[in-house]
């Protein structure tokens, strides 16, 4: 039975940790509320916070619930223990992908080195957790990830993975996502700290996301746009020359948030591949502004068109019945294509040309002969 003395600040931390390890979510939440969240970043053994303990829980369901509870209640995501390790570092060592995804969503730093110079990326590579490593390099492929950084022993993440024979980790680091992350870091855009120096620990009073990390409001903005709610991101898309197809079947907020972080499941990918969203020229769905949507599937269309969401935008040189089909990836969802028609302008460029596959779609009506379709090949 819980006694009043168990709710004093010092004993409250112990009570909360015991409730968490016993899987008592309601009791843990009660202790947090009773102490006005004053223990949320208190230290336990080895200087670890409740968040660091939560990422190590063996049960996946309880682990996800407690990690989300602590993060939503304001736990500092980048605090360090006595060995300089963060919650993300501990989660990467154990290969707990669900915890890693939540920590990155709340601005966890994948380059925060511990006292031995090992970053979370290095821990994932050394322990052979290929799925965790692939998620990290995909999520930070545009923001940059210093994959060439060495620990105190002079080893990089790639060398750690290769020395232990972790082929999936080597592939993740040397594949297209790893190369993109390393190239973005090499450009030196918005560098957090000088090379070789560990990132400073975040204090509870000053928890601003790093400039290179995706802040939560920005992720929410992407999620609203992906959820078909329009809003600020939707209006920005109109002005940039890219036309986004509407639809109530776009992912809801929570699922879109995970997609924006690169957390793409096989089930999610299969659901989007299953339905072909085709746009009919001169159909009731067309509004004249490049925003069309229908469930029709073009007879005789190539398999790439029949298995992927398709957007339509007016072709610059075509007649009223011609158009340009485009399947373009959102920069924040690497495996999920966006319903975006590719129009000429600043958005076209080397990336489009390098990944585009032009297909000529002949009649019958309502499609005119010579309608041009451009489908981006999946990056492997």
From Swiss-Prot:
UniProt keyword terms in alphabetical order: ANK repeat, Phosphoprotein, Repeat
Domain of life, per lineage: Eukaryota
Sequence segments annotated as region (Disordered): 181-256, 309-368
Low complexity bias (residue ranges): 181-203, 216-226
Database matches in PROSITE patterns: ANK_REP_REGION (PS50297), ANK_REPEAT (PS50088)
Sites bearing Phosphoserine, chain numbering: 193, 294
Repeat positions for ANK: 11-40, 46-79, 83-112, 116-145, 153-182
Name by which UniProt lists this protein: Ankyrin repeat domain-containing protein 63
Organism, scientific name: Homo sapiens
